[in-house]
From Swiss-Prot:
It is a peripheral membrane protein. NDH-1 can be composed of about 15 different subunits; different subcomplexes with different compositions have been identified which probably have different functions. [4Fe-4S] cluster binds at residues 63-64, 128, 159. This is NAD(P)H-quinone oxidoreductase subunit K. The keyword Lipid metabolism does not apply. It comes from Crocosphaera subtropica (strain ATCC 51142 / BH68). Its main location: membrane. GO terms for cellular component: plasma membrane-derived thylakoid membrane; respiratory chain complex I. Its EC number is 7.1.1.-. Belongs to the complex I 20 kDa subunit family.
Length: 247
């Protein structure tokens, strides 16, 4: 007579349950127990908590912020990423610069960044924030890149970038946070940006605007051709010099 496999399996399961309830011998890790245990490290647990609750400080100065404001609505719903907008830099660990950074707003941006607790991250959103955009050629007040002021972790090119691009930047930032360690955060690391850290060979030239424009020879005495063309009278101090030139 062949044994019943179903009855043997139920007997084994009953025996395992009795050992768990009253272990007379050295216990073994059963399948039920292994499925309810999570093995991790302090770094992974800490990074998981931080990347799941990034609190951004919204710094919108131009039209790129309109695209970011679309994320707050129900269509995109950026709350599902754990992003909670904060109005105080002391409660935020992420600042998103959306729009043109001007010389007047640069000190305020740097101060907000310095007031944020460590570790902190920066996302540069839009062409105007990254390189100055359409204001980079002739504007006298636009900063040519926010990374001249604060270190940037993720760049989002576009004019303006779509909300989907912002989600992609958030995902890339979450991957960066997940790879960090507590030992790296405990040491003070100097963050450099592309301009000050790149060696270059530049020739120093004398300034063009020295404030002595009125002291130039052409301003002290108008050229002869100019006086003759517009019919100016020759100053008495230059009359003798004119006579010498004509002789």
């Amino acid at each position: 007579m062949s044994p019943n496999p179903t009855s043997d399996l139920s007997a084994i399961e009953q025996l395992q349950k009795e050992k768990i309830l009253n272990p007379a011998a050295r216990g073994q890790v059963t399948q039920d127990l292994s499925e309810n245990i999570i093995l991790t490290t302090v770094d992974d647990l800490h990074n998981w908590a931080r990347l799941s609750s990034l609190w951004p400080l919204l710094y919108g100065t131009a039209c790129c912020f309109i695209e970011f404001a679309a994320l707050i609505g129900s269509r995109f719903d950026f709350d599902r990423f754990g992003l909670v907008p904060r109005s105080s830099p002391r409660q935020a660990d992420l600042i998103i610069t959306a729009g043109t950074i001007t010389m007047k707003m640069a000190p305020a941006l740097v101060r907000l960044y310095e007031e944020m607790p460590d570790p902190k991250y920066v996302i540069a959103m839009g062409a105007c924030t990254i390189t100055g955009g359409m204001f980079s050629s002739d504007s006298t007040t636009a900063v040519r890149g926010v990374d001249k002021l604060i270190p940037v972790d993720v760049y989002i090119p576009g004019c303006p970038p779509r909300p989907e691009a912002i989600f992609d930047a958030i995902i890339k930032l979450r991957k960066k946070v997940s790879n960090e360690t507590i030992q790296e955060r405990s040491t003070v690391m100097e963050q450099t940006h592309r301009y000050y850290s790149t060696p270059h060979n530049m020739k120093a030239v004398s300034p063009i605007l020295t404030g002595k424009y009125l002291a130039t020879p052409t301003r002290q005495a108008p050229p002869k051709e100019l006086t003759e063309a517009i019919g100016m009278e020759v100053p008495p101090a230059l009359a003798s010099q004119k006579q010498k030139e004509e002789a």
